[in-house]
């Protein structure tokens, strides 16, 4: 049997299993781990996923790009008009659908130095799904679940609301960064994508329109420097802070979460 035939056969079996498990009513929770594990393994083992940003590391880099200035974000210092979580380690996702787990992994690294769980271990706890499955990607509930299971203190848009104005958003960002807390955010980038806000620069004035955000991006392939950092317009992000088609209708607007480990002392991160 050809490899393509095997792939199609297993995919068909997977679809049947998903239909059966997904239509079992009250038994849904009992089968959720089976579905999550099945769909993840099908994608990873059968080649239905291109391997995410990690699979093309450096291939889109352009040395001395005339269009994008190279900034050594890792070695930037916070001060003046710039609020920054210094030495923030980035990470590139290994599938096309695990931006949420990959973003969360960087937050764990930020606080603990190393992440005790792998990207796919985090994805399993979060209930992360590939495209074509109910609730694809990782929603805010799933993102929060991982940290809550670890005993971390979690705040999110579902329980605490979201900034209603751009000015409130900037204050929200600054308040967290001053406490050494990165902000995981999901917006319409790539149709729906989790990144982590780790910096904000007012550019030295109160204009607001020229403010920039520095984000850790687990799919960093579009600025000619595959270092895991993006520098983006704060206003542009705020007005594009919604999900395109992945999340449920009531969870599409301005999704975010923060998480800090037990006993976290913000004074140590300032």
Functional labels for PLM-detected ranges:
Residues 24-38:
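Ser/Thr/Pro/Gly-rich low-complexity linker/stalk segments immediately outside membranes or between
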Residues 56-57, 62-161, 244-247, 252-270:
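Cysteine-nucleophile protease catalytic domains, especially the papain-like/related folds used
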